[in-house]
């Protein structure tokens, strides 16, 4: 026994080699404390049969569960929230609120029994009322906080508690299931880690915090339990956290193959006295999870190993490159907390929410899970808002890859390229849609497995191509169902706008906070009246012909595919989605065929990790780009379409991108009225030479050392030419920059000159401008040195001997009527493409 422990210790020491270890004042060792691990996921590893770090990995590989006990647990959380805020809260209102929040889960839960659920839920409510009354005879109810979050960089932990008070005197973790004795070890570990966070973040001792476990299945006398501190178990939990971090960093450094052989069920059995229980109940479930990993071909195993390694490398690379100054946008998860000094996540009770609306004046945050805020929170006057980090996207990618591994061999072989896609040439269009689109629409319809549609800037990929694809599918097969998805909330909003305009019936998945208010009535949670019937909602979901969602929502809530079959899935923005995040969805047996719409010549998905491992280079590609290359290498053209008619850029603006980036595609104007104009509609008299240049040239490069001043000067001049009556901040002018700090510099210069009329114009980075357009674009390159030039021109690739600069392509193709560029000419000319650009458009 001693020998075995000694060997384990040696193995652990080897695992920790090269990692940063922080030693706290009490001697507690924390490996890589900057890596934050969720408390609940650590606690979930503590089972009767052991607590092995591989259990953490296996839990990340398991498909998302959707069971009646989980639904009941979520309901209990909703009930606790409502009872805290209103002691007389109505049971029916609680049921409706929970149903609204989890409509998709209720509809797709296979073991759901409405009668039993209602009985169990009522018992939970009665017990919660008793517990709340008991707790708040001693504590101040107005100080109650529901689901406050914490980040502890001393321990490398993050998490959220079900209930506590703002004075930190009370901490309660709620469980809706069975106790199995006094309480489960996993639940004990969870509250011990929460207490550890309070101790190390706020220097609280055990006597100052009342820690309780609330088992709301039981009356208060049996279910509300005091929890005493157990330092030995707490340290064991931190040790497991260290092993988890070390294991995942090992995968990132040495590859998934370094642990793959250890992913066997018996590894998790550490307590032999529990072997009967383990082999009877636990082992079969683990085998079902892991079986696909061990039944892949050599090629598929190599693919999986590379992709999983890439995902873990990306997880840690994002940690190193995360920036709290990163610009927030609608749909982002954030922490917000009371500002009472310098911002510091670790020394505040955090609230978690989603950005609902954001502009220069205001940020509206939707509290997590529609929680009600307590009086103690609402009376605060000033808040700090910071991005909320999460491993959810990494876990979603892992589960997506596992879904691919468990897919049918035919689907796997198709996506791996060992099986050629099929075509049914007997298919014909139901009607003619548009001469520029009919050939592509026909070939897309004839594609039996997949079709790739390249949509360069301004070619109407959503407003025209996607609309026609939807109309053709439903007119030819009225009983068919479509799944439409995209990477960003904005793209999903654009899809919804197209469907509204074309009069289609559809549902949108996701939260109200992330949805444009124009389409909130299409959310599943809005699709029923005040007293919904599960059968009605399920029928609505089953019958609706179109479902729209972001790809991340489909990854994290894959339950839809268990009840609804789709003849066609169309993925917009497909060139911005890394392969692991989409391959599981597209290999599902619930989807017959798919169409990917994208443009590999625009900016791809952001990858944080360096491109220093040749084996992982292909992992940086989207599935769209990989399949596009695959089709070209196979010499097949029938499964690829290119939209060539663009209605955005005036031909003078399109000339340079056409020559340098779209040599094969050769984009042509539609032409729209503004594309036929011979001159710019600037009628005010020129006051100097620069005014005259701006009036005469559609594309113009202006050298500048102080770019912010020049940009604001040009903005003033263009505003005068456009005129107050015609100026529209959302359409007239936009400013594109390379770095975020340029935004602040330009805004400060505008404020200094008192240009309030220009406050509403969009000033943003190239990455954020992708998908947008303005009549006039001003592009401030912001390059001051060779490193900056390298950064500016880093997103390039070679195609047919030509260099395609994706970032420059996106910047140039946002403008409809005029494009103004500025920057350090001498430095920019050291790049071949910029050198030609400057020579061609300088005066």
Predicted regions and their residues:
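Metal-dependent nuclease catalytic cores that hydrolyze phosphodiester bonds in DNA/RNA
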Residues: 1-166
């Amino acid at each position: 026994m001693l020998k075995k422990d000694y060997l384990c210790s040696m193995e652990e020491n080897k695992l920790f080699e090269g990692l940063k270890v922080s030693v706290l004042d009490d001697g507690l060792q924390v490996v890589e404390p900057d890596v934050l691990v969720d408390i609940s996921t650590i606690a979930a590893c503590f089972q009767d049969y052991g607590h092995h770090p591989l259990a953490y990995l296996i839990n990340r590989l398991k498909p998302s569960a959707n069971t009646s006990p989980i639904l009941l647990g979520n309901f209990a959380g909703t009930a606790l929230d409502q009872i805290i805020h209103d002691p007389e809260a109505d049971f029916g209102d609680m049921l409706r609120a929970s149903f609204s929040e989890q409509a998709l889960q209720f509809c797709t839960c296979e073991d759901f029994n409405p009668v039993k659920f209602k009985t169990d839920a009522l018992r939970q409510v009665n017990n919660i009322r008793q517990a709340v009354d008991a707790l708040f005879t001693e504590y101040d109810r107005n100080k109650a906080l529901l689901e406050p979050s914490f980040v502890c960089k001393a321990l490398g932990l993050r998490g959220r508690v079900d209930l506590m008070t703002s004075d930190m005197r009370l901490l309660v973790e709620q469980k809706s299931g069975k106790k199995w004795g006094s309480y489960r070890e996993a639940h004990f570990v969870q509250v011990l880690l929460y207490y550890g966070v309070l101790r190390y973040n706020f220097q609280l001792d055990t006597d100052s915090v009342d820690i309780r476990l609330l088992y709301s299945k039981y009356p208060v006398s049996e279910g509300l339990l005091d929890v005493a501190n157990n330092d030995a178990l707490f340290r064991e939990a931190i040790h497991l956290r260290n092993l988890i971090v070390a294991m995942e960093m090992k995968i990132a450094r040495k590859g998934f193959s370094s642990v793959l052989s250890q992913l066997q069920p018996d590894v998790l059995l550490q307590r032999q006295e529990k072997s009967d229980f383990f082999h009877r109940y636990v082992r079969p479930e683990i085998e079902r999870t892991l079986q696909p990993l061990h039944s892949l071909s050599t090629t598929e195993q190599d693919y999986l190993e590379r992709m999983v390694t890439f995902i873990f490398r990306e997880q840690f690379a994002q940690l190193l490159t995360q920036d709290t100054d990163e610009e927030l946008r609608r749909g982002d998860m954030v922490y917000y907390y009371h500002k009472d000094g310098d911002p510091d996540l670790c020394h505040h009770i955090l609230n978690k929410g989603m950005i609902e609306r954001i502009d220069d004046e205001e940020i509206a945050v939707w509290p997590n899970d529609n929680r009600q805020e307590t009086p103690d929170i609402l009376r605060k006057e000033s808040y700090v808002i910071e991005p909320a980090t999460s491993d959810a996207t990494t876990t979603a990618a892992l589960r997506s890859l596992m879904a691919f591994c468990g897919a049918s061999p035919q689907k796997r072989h198709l996506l791996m390229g060992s099986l050629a896609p099929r075509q049914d040439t007997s298919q014909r269009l139901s009607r003619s849609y548009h001469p520029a689109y009919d050939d592509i629409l026909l070939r897309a319809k004839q594609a039996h497995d997949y079709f790739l549609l390249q949509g360069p800037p301004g070619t109407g990929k959503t407003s025209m191509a996607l609309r026609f694809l939807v109309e053709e599918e439903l007119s030819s097969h009225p009983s068919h169902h479509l799944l439409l998805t995209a990477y960003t909330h904005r793209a999903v909003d654009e899809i919804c706008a197209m469907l509204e305009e074309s009069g289609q019936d559809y549902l949108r998945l996701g939260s109200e906070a992330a949805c444009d208010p124009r389409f909130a009535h299409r959310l599943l949670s809005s699709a029923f009246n005040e007293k919904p019937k599960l059968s009605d909602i399920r029928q609505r979901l089953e019958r609706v012909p179109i479902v729209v969602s972001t790809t991340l929502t489909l990854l994290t809530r894959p339950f839809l595919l268990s009840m609804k079959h789709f003849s066609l899935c169309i993925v917009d923005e497909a060139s911005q989605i890394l392969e692991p995040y989409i391959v599981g969805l597209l290999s599902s047996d619930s989807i017959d065929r798919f169409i990917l719409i994208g443009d590999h010549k625009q900016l791809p998905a952001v990858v944080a990790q360096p491109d220093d491992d040749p084996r992982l280079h292909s992992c940086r590609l989207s599935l769209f780009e990989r399949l596009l290359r695959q089709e070209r290498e196979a010499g097949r053209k029938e499964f690829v379409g290119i939209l060539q008619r663009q209605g955005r850029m005036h031909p003078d603006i399109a000339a340079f991108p056409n020559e340098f980036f779209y040599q094969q595609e050769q984009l042509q104007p539609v032409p729209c009225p503004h594309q036929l104009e011979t001159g710019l509609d600037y009628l005010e008299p020129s006051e100097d030479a620069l005014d005259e240049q701006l009036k005469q040239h559609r594309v113009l490069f202006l050298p500048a050392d102080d770019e912010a001043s020049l940009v604001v000067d040009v903005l003033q001049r263009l505003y005068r030419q456009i005129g107050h009556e015609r100026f529209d901040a959302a359409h007239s002018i936009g400013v594109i920059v390379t770095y975020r700090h340029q935004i602040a510099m330009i805004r400060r210069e505008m404020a200094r000159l008192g240009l309030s009329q220009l406050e509403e114009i969009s000033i943003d980075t190239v990455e954020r401008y992708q998908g947008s357009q303005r009549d006039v674009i001003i592009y401030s390159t912001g390059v001051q040195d060779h490193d900056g030039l390298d950064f500016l021109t880093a997103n390039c690739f070679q195609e047919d001997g030509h260099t395609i600069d994706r970032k420059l392509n996106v910047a140039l193709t946002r403008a409809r009527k005029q494009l103004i560029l500025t920057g350090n000419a001498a430095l920019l000319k050291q790049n071949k493409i910029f050198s030609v650009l400057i020579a061609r458009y300088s005066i």
